[in-house]
Amino acid sequence: QPLEDGTVTVSRANASYRFPSRIILIGAMNPCPCGYYGDKEHICECTPSQIRHYTQKLSGPLLDRFDIQIQVPRVSYQELTAVKKAETSAQIRQRVMAARERQLYRFQKMDIVSNGQLTHSMLGQYCPMTAEAEQLLETAFHQRQMSARSYDRLVKVARTIGDLAGKDTITAEYIGEALLMRNDNIAKAL
């Protein structure tokens, strides 16, 4: 529970001590032992049982605690050298700062400062959705057999995407984007 509660309790002999533990948990792993599963340019040499054994090293409950789970494919030479019009770091920084301000304003009367700190019971009040967004979320919940924790984290990511777009209501577009960043099937597919 330290990841959800933001505190660690250490119990010794006659006393218990609580310490703050608000962290950002980040992890990375190869898709298989050889690293080439799903690669378009290299052939994976792993057997299905090797891949399954490898991916089962991370438990479902641990994976559930990652808000964003994405596969990052190899970048081709053409993609690497292509000239693209993209947001500058300064533009992205401005959007992030504006989103943080929205969250601070939203939670000014609460004991929280960000969407990541929302509890399940707060989602209805602070994460209003369009009917289309709710329908997409319900469909995804059943199709992906999501846990309650996965559901909560998906909604919070969608709320943050809305904040980055400067919107108060979660749309189907934001749910869809959050679903793309919550690839619960990474380990299941292997």
What residues fall within each predicted segment?
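Basic, amphipathic alpha-helical bundle interface domains used for macromolecular binding and assembly
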Residues: 2-189
